[in-house]
Amino acid sequence: MDSNTITSFQDILQRMSKMQLESSSADLNGMITQFERLKIYRDSLGESVMRMGDLHSLQNRNATWRDELSQKFEEIRWLIAECRNILTRTENSFEQITFLQALQLLLEVESEIRTFSFQLI
């Protein structure tokens, strides 16, 4: 994983953890948790691609990896929708910057996961 992406994930997660949005903190904590899981999934998928011979063990270990992949794309779409929703509601510039960066990061990660998955298929 690119060091800028790691820094971006860490920066966004840190800033989100300091926020108090009008929506419940449970919603924000859920977003943070999903961001963290998405990062871990992306890292593990990237590592599998790096070890291209790992494709068969990945398929043997988890016959439903395509379903998992589909679920991750659904999570990304949900996170993108949530970021957009927050952006339309908030007037706080700190929140706007944070969620614009989160949105950009999600789009980058979605693209990377697509690239990794095509290499594994």
Curated annotation (Swiss-Prot):
GO terms of biological process kind: exit of virus from host cell nucleus through nuclear pore
Localization (cell): Virion; Host nucleus
Motif position, Nuclear export signal: 12-21, 85-94
Major localization listed first in the record, in broad terms: virion
One GO cellular component term: virion component
Keywords from the named record: Host nucleus, Host-virus interaction, Transport, Virion
Gene3D superfamilies: 1.10.287.230
Keyword Cell membrane tagged: no
Pfam families: Flu_NS2
InterPro entries: Flu_NS2
Function: Mediates the nuclear export of encapsidated genomic RNAs (ribonucleoproteins, RNPs). Acts as an adapter between viral RNPs complexes and the nuclear export machinery of the cell. Possesses no intrinsic RNA-binding activity, but includes a C-terminal M1-binding domain. This domain is believed to allow recognition of RNPs bound to the protein M1.
Additional notes on this entry: Average number present in a viral particle is estimated to be 130-200 molecules.
Family: Belongs to the influenza viruses NEP family.
Quaternary data: Interacts with protein M1. May interact with host nucleoporin RAB/HRB and exportin XPO1/CRM1.
Protein name: Nuclear export protein
Gene from which the chain derives: NS
